[in-house]
């Protein structure tokens, strides 16, 4: 998920999935909590007296004879999303977390954080507005690591995986703590500096917010609605899946009605500063120089209908060669792909997750 408009699209898809029979299977109930990090220092030089990181977990950590956790799985969301979004999405958790499924929550300890600026974690809309520290991906990954190690006392991860922004964070985890995990699964991203069209649409969203007089330098009382309307339009296109959209909106009236509903939902859910910060946080992402530091088996999955990571660039095919145990899979366009949002539809890629789990990590089941 890349922004709250895409998060809204995923939520809409979740409702569709539920009505189509993808009900959430019974399993352990989630536990939610908050981890406070005091005097958090950001890459920008700013500090926050207390950074709140919200999280959702399923299951119970299990330890080996030496006391190391053997069954923890870290799952990271996309820009504008949250761990709760993934936990509540039938096409994701409903395909993975239930009894007998690949990440059965009765066997694994599943950790789904809300990143800085997202969900119920500390964010600009809590009250600081544009005075909130200018966080970036390095800050977010550091906070994730401190949650896992200091907050939840997990010293080893069976699997690190993430969608979109979380996909990019997955590469950073593999580089920063290469021996901490048994396997990595980045879903829907590339491992280079964000440039070209991928940078352009982000710049367009940032400019739309900052150039709206109603934004008032971030100190608005009422949301800058024209800015949010433009951002919503851009992200709908960025997250588009032509075949799925044609199927679900076969007439002009269908398309017009969809746009109106998507815009209404987006405007109701979104704070402009939160959106601005979230989109801008990718500004210095570039793991390309350290891909060779990744030692855990890595299964990298993109889809051929992803507007944000277009397959014709061939970036992943070249980069995966730099990863010692890296495998790249490009999913062909089909009934189970949903553009960039394919990352949330586990039915499209869970067979590759099964392969990764079988080929990596402890040989005994958790």
What are these regions (language model features)?
Residues 325-366:
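Catalytic active-site module of serine/aspartate enzymes centered on a nucleophile-bearing elbow/loop
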Residues 155-196:
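Conserved hydrolase catalytic core segment
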Residues 180-265:
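Alpha/beta-hydrolase-fold enzymes
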Residues 294, 300-302:
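Short beta-strand/loop motif that positions the catalytic acidic residue
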Residues 56-126:
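N-terminal cap/lid subdomain of alpha/beta-hydrolase-fold enzymes
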Residues 138-158:
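Conserved acidic catalytic loop of the alpha/beta-hydrolase fold
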Residues 261, 274-290:
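Active-site nucleophile elbow and catalytic-triad environment of alpha/beta-hydrolase enzymes
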């Amino acid at each position: 998920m890349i922004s709250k408009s895409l998060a809204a699209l995923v939520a809409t898809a979740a409702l569709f999935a539920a009505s189509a029979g993808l009900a959430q299977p019974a399993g352990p109930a989630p536990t939610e909590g908050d981890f406070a990090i005091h005097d958090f220092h950001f890459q920008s030089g700013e500090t926050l007296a207390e950074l709140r990181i919200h999280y959702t977990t399923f299951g119970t950590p299990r330890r080996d004879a030496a006391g190391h956790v053997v069954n923890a799985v870290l799952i990271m969301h996309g820009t504008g999303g949250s761990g709760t979004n993934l936990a509540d999405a039938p096409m994701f958790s409903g395909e993975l977390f239930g009894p007998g499924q690949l990440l059965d929550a009765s066997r694994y300890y599943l950790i789904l954080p809300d990143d800085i600026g997202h969900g119920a974690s500390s964010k600009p809309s809590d009250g600081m507005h544009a005075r909130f520290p200018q966080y970036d991906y390095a800050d977010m990954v550091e906070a994730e690591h401190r949650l896992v190690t200091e907050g939840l006392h997990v010293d080893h991860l069976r699997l690190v995986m993430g969608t979109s922004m979380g996909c990019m964070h997955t590469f950073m985890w593999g580089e920063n703590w290469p021996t901490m995990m048994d396997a990595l699964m980045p879903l829907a991203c590339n491992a280079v500096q964000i440039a070209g069209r991928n940078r352009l649409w982000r710049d367009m969203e940032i400019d739309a917010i900052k150039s709206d007089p109603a934004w008032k330098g971030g100190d608005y009382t009422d949301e800058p609605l024209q800015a949010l309307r433009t951002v919503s339009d851009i992200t709908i296109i960025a997250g588009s899946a032509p075949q799925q959209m044609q199927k679900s909106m076969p007439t002009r009236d269908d398309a017009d009605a969809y746009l109106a509903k998507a815009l209404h939902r987006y405007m109701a859910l979104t704070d402009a500063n939160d959106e601005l910060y979230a989109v801008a946080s990718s500004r210095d992402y570039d793991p390309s120089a350290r891909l060779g530091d990744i030692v855990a088996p890595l299964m990298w999955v993109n889809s051929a209908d992803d507007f944000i990571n277009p397959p014709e660039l061939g970036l992943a095919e070249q980069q995966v060669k730099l990863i010692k145990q890296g495998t790249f899979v490009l999913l062909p366009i089909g009934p189970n792909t949903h553009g960039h949002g394919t990352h949330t539809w586990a039915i499209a890629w869970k067979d590759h997750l099964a392969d990764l789990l079988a080929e990596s990590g402890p040989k005994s089941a958790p």
